């Protein structure tokens, strides 16, 4: 096998001219044919094992809803990847590839170590590892090629975020990277732009080649948002991409993979399905990204991640991004990253974004609806506001949505039992402000990139303090301020101590009744969850009566006559 070489022959100009026209990302077409009866819905088992309808997609109106998504810890999940062949890697025989592109800008080189230290201190930035490059303070200093730089400036960004300032030199240097930063900090662009540079320095894909860049994400929503960023910034280089995730037909994804894509953004389960079926391979992957690594481990994806990485050459560049740095994530980094360099933005202790005003009210369950309405009346006085309401279960999400709509509020709900087409529609209605109230379960607590959410309302308190921080992190993004309102009941008293710690660190007011709970309950909190949390029964109802419209009952409920917005 001949060497790829490292020379300029594969730089962007030759790549572009040889690639002739192919256009940007393929988009994911939904593959639904006329109408699309979901038929009688399958039973669950395994994550995603709940069938999304036993009947085909053809034929008039949607039939019964498919079975539920099932639990992540079922048998199907543990068997995923059993059919993948163990790879034996001989590095001497593998084609060589380029991964080091960073040249330090003169202005960066001239800064004293004291200037660098002050910049890092100002941005609460800590670095670890051998020979960590200095941070950059402007886009020009990052050293991106002009075709990347022009795309960035066209988006109107002022200057790099903290994670980008330090993360870009690290990723462009070809080193393995760990980045720890809060959601909404600009992590996606931190690895996307170096990925584009990396692709344009590699040989073109040959027929049958898999992707060059693989990005693993925990949820469909996050995967779709990453795809949007890659499509936007990779357009000028004609970089092709596809998004591979469950809950939708495989056909369009298979077609994209068979045509050849430089970037594959995937959730672990569906990617393993594709690998086992021989629809793609990972032999060409030289740039691997694990986004929201902590969330993927929380959801029980560790065995699948390990199986996927076993299919990728060991001298690849790996970038791991996470909002937290628990021991499980540290172990994953130790196992799969070589001589990595790390940047942490903010405190390593669990803490909330200080731009968010946190209001915690101790209430009883029967008070919640009235208090929610009172808050919404105040929030929606400003028609530009958007409110994301979190509930503990899918059933309550639907009940609350139906209640709000009947009361005249333009609310819609999103959770794992809803079909992907409906979820996409709800997200778009919320993003565009047509429906400024969205009710969600924790499926939406990470990865939903709606940057102008002004308020988060925790109707039900989550299972642990990490999920609380990630939920409220949906507001106060990209430098904006936000407000988080949380209903806390005596049933949540074991979480009181952790919550008070977070509120105190962020210098927030504390409800005296909450402080009293800490004193009298001795509440120690539930820790940080664990892998077993997502295990569970498959099943799901399936077989509901068909309706002519595309959406579930809660989102189809008519708005009451007393329009509230």
From Swiss-Prot:
Annotated function: ATP-dependent RNA helicase involved nonsense-mediated mRNA decay and ribosome biogenesis through rRNA processing.
Domains as described in the record: The Q motif is unique to and characteristic of the DEAD box family of RNA helicases and controls ATP binding and hydrolysis.
Ranges annotated as biased composition (Gly residues): 1-10, 19-44, 526-546
Any one biological process term the GO annotation gives: nuclear-transcribed mRNA catabolic process, nonsense-mediated decay
Enzyme class of the recorded protein, top EC level: hydrolase
Entry EC no(s): 3.6.4.13
Keyword field: ATP-binding, Cytoplasm, Helicase, Hydrolase, Nonsense-mediated mRNA decay, Nucleotide-binding, Nucleus, Ribosome biogenesis, RNA-binding, rRNA processing
Subunit structure: Associates with polysomes.
SUPFAM superfamilies: P-loop containing nucleoside triphosphate hydrolases
Entry keyword annotation includes RNA-binding: yes
SMART domains from the UniProt entry: DEXDc (SM00487), HELICc (SM00490)
GO molecular function: ATP binding; ATP hydrolysis activity; RNA binding; RNA helicase activity
Residues of the Helicase ATP-binding domain: 168-343
Gene3D superfamilies per the UniProt record, alphabetical: P-loop containing nucleotide triphosphate hydrolases
GO cellular component, one term: cytoplasm
Subcellular location: Cytoplasm; Nucleus
Annotated catalysed reactions: ATP + H2O = ADP + phosphate + H(+)
Source species: Aspergillus niger (strain ATCC MYA-4892 / CBS 513.88 / FGSC A1513)
Full protein name: ATP-dependent RNA helicase dbp2
UniProt xrefs under Pfam families: DEAD, Helicase_C
